[in-house]
Every structure is written in structure tokens, then in C-alpha cells.
Amino acid sequence: MSKLQKRLLLTKVKQNRTLSLEHLFSREVKFNMAVSIATSFRTSAKSTSISHNNRTVNDPLKNDKYHKHIDWDKTDKNIILVQRPIKEVYDENFGEAVTQYNAKQKRTDRQVKNYFEKVKKDKTLDLQREFIVQFGDKGLCEEYPDTREAFAFQLEKYADWFRQQFPDLKIYNAVIHMDEATPHLHMNVVPVATGYKQGITKRPSFSKWFKNNEIDFKQFREMQVEKLDELVQEMGAVRKIVGTHEYEKPS
């Protein structure tokens, strides 16, 4: 069992010792166990669109093929959890390591002037990664309209759990879309990996982050699925098995 898995297990044990059934307040929805809810956890190494996620696209683009599925009248109901400039996150997490690296360079042409731009050109590193998390589907939300708020609340809880359990996956943007057929979470993170003996000692690398935490991408995915299953059970339902969760192995 890896260090990360042990920490997650310890956290779960502590929660089980003290947790009484949580009330979802105005967003509480309790299903009969016969109801099954599909969950989805997807990611890829492709570039993201923060303007799409934050709904800051220009008016002419709102009706193009990439945005026609959005109900713009409901966009004000979207829930912004985190919204930070990615360059700010880079400065905060890698700035000191870059400064230390530059101080050791005898030639100024070897110094790194802009680490963010350097990473963008480096195929061995990960500028960022986006996760998309969802409960239910369009049919379920139409059959049980109250589930939209309940799913949003569970997505907030998932994002908070993720932030606490994976502190070196720095969330710089997270928003729950309520203006589409099914509520879902877009969460963008920057992986912070340490342990490099040469060059810059901290770098954005998922493969190195996995190595630091003694897990692989499959185990990481299983942790997410287990948490989503737990959140489904909190609503008195069971997770619907609809196939494998999409996960693209980090490069």
C-alpha cells in the first residue's frame, strides 16, 4: 500500500468514527436504493478552454457548435469554486525553485526567464490537466428535477475532498456547470512534483507526481471512483455501472 493510499485510508477511518448522516439542507435528495446513478470521471492531456469553462466567451461564439448545448439563461447558476490565473499558481509553486536554479547559473543565457512559457514548450512536462466529474445523466435529471441541486452539492464535496487529499495537485480553476443538461464539474490542476536532483528541483509532472506518491494512474482513477461511489451512497442510491471511466495516461 502506497503512502498516499495509507493517508486516504486513515482519513476515511477518522471520518467513519465521527460521521453522522450528513444533511444536505435545501439540496437534500434521498433515493430508494433501487435507483442507480451513473458517475463519470474523465481527463486527458489535451489543452483546456478556461474561457469555455468560466463562460467568458465573446457573444459571437455563444451560438457556435461548441456552445450550442449551453442554456445561457441559466449560466448565472453556475458555481465557481476556484478561479485563479494559472501563471499565479506557477509563480507561487515554482518561483523559488526557478530562482535557486538561476542563481547557480554562471551564464545568464542559461537562466530561465519565464518558466511558464518554458513548460509550454517542454513535452516531458504537464502544463496542467483538466478533470471532468459528473453524477447522473439527462434522463435522471429530467425524471428527478431536484437532483440537479443535490448533484451540485455532492460535486462541491468531491472538489473539497480532492483538494485535501491531493494537496500537490494545485487547483487553479474549478466550476460546476448548471447550464447544461446534467450538472458536472470542470476542475483544472497543476501537478507539483519534487525530488529532481538536477536542474529545477520542482516541476509540473504527473508521471513524477505519481512516482512521488507510489501509485500509478490506474490506482489514482480507482480512488476517484471509490469517492464518487461513496457520495452516491450518501444520497441513498447505488452507482450504476456503465463501463470504464475514461482516463488518458499522463505523458
Question: Where do the PLM segments sit?
Answer:
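N-terminal nicking endonuclease/strand-transfer module with a His-rich metal-binding environment
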Residues: 1-251
